[in-house]
Amino acid sequence: MLLLPLLVLLCVVSVSSSGSQTCEETLKTCSVIACGRDGRDGPKGEKGEPGQGLRGLQGPPGKLGPPGSVGAPGSQGPKGQKGDRGDSRAIEVKLANMEAEINTLKSKLELTNKLHAFSMGKKSGKKFFVTNHERMPFSKVKALCSELRGTVAIPRNAEENKAIQEVAKTSAFLGITDEVTEGQFMYVTGGRLTYSNWKKDEPNDHGSGEDCVTIVDNGLWNDISCQASHTAVCEFPA
C-alpha cells in the first residue's frame, strides 16, 4: 500500500521537471530499484552426476595367472577320405631284405657261439689251433671246421705238430687222407705231404679202409677208419 503513493510522488516530481511529458508516460519510464537484505540459503540440491575426466595411459600388463583346467575333449571330426592304395611290391622287397638281414645275424650268432665253445686253443706260427674236445667222425669234423671258416688241423712242421698234440691232449683227426688214391696221403686242402710223423709200421691200412689219419697223445700219427670218432681240432689263420 505504501509503494503506490511513493510511485505517484515520483511521477509528480518527474512531470514538474520535464514539462511536456504526461504522467502516464513518465510512469512507464520510471525504474524502481528495491535494495533489501540477502535472503537465507535455500535447501541443499540433489547430488549431481559424476564428472568424466581425460582418459589416462594404459597401465603395464599384470602377472600371468595360473593355467586353467583342461577342457573337455572336443567332438570327433568327420571321417576322412579313403587313402591311396599302398605299393605292396615295395613292402615285399623291404620284408625280404629284413628277413635276409635277420638270417645273416643268426648265422653270425651261431658261428660266434660255436667258436666260443672252442675254449682251448694254441697259436703256432701263422696258425691258430682250437678244439671243443668233442669226438665225432671225420666227415663231421670237416663240416664243423668248414662252418667255422676254418679247416681240419694240418701240421706242416714239428712245431705245428706239437701245438696240435698239446691242444687235443688225446687222439684227434688231422686234415690228411688217402681217400682219393690208396696209399697216397694228401692234405684235404690239396697237395702231397711235406711233413709226416708216423708211428712205427704206419700207415698200414690195417683191415683196409683206414683212409684217415689221427695224431695220438705222444704226437705220432696213425692211419685209422674215417668212420671212427676222434677229437675235432680246427685251424685258422692267426
UniProtKB/Swiss-Prot annotation:
InterPro entries: C-type_lectin-like, C-type_lectin-like/link_sf, C-type_lectin_CS, Ca-dependent_lectin, Collagen, Collectin_CTLD, CTDL_fold
Residues given in the record as Ca(2+) 1 binding sites: 178, 182, 205, 210-211
GO cellular component annotations of the record: collagen trimer; extracellular space; multivesicular body
Subunit record text: Homotrimer. Forms higher oligomeric complexes formed by the association of two, three or more homotrimers. Oligomerization occurs in the endoplasmic reticulum. Interacts with MASP1 and MASP2.
Record-listed Ca(2+) 2 binding positions: 202, 204, 210, 222-223
Residue ranges of the region described as Calcium-dependent carbohydrate binding: 202-210
PTMs per UniProt: Hydroxylated on lysine and proline residues within the collagen-like domain.
Tissue expression per record: Detected in blood serum (at protein level).
Name of the protein in question: Mannose-binding protein A
GO biological process: complement activation, classical pathway; complement activation, lectin pathway; defense response to Gram-positive bacterium; killing by host of symbiont cells; positive regulation of phagocytosis; protein homotrimerization; surfactant homeostasis
GO terms assigned for molecular function: calcium ion binding; calcium-dependent carbohydrate binding; calcium-dependent protein binding; D-mannose binding; identical protein binding; oligosaccharide binding; phosphatidylinositol-4-phosphate binding; polysaccharide binding
Region of interest called Disordered, as start-end residue ranges on this chain: 38-87
Chain coiled-coil ranges: none
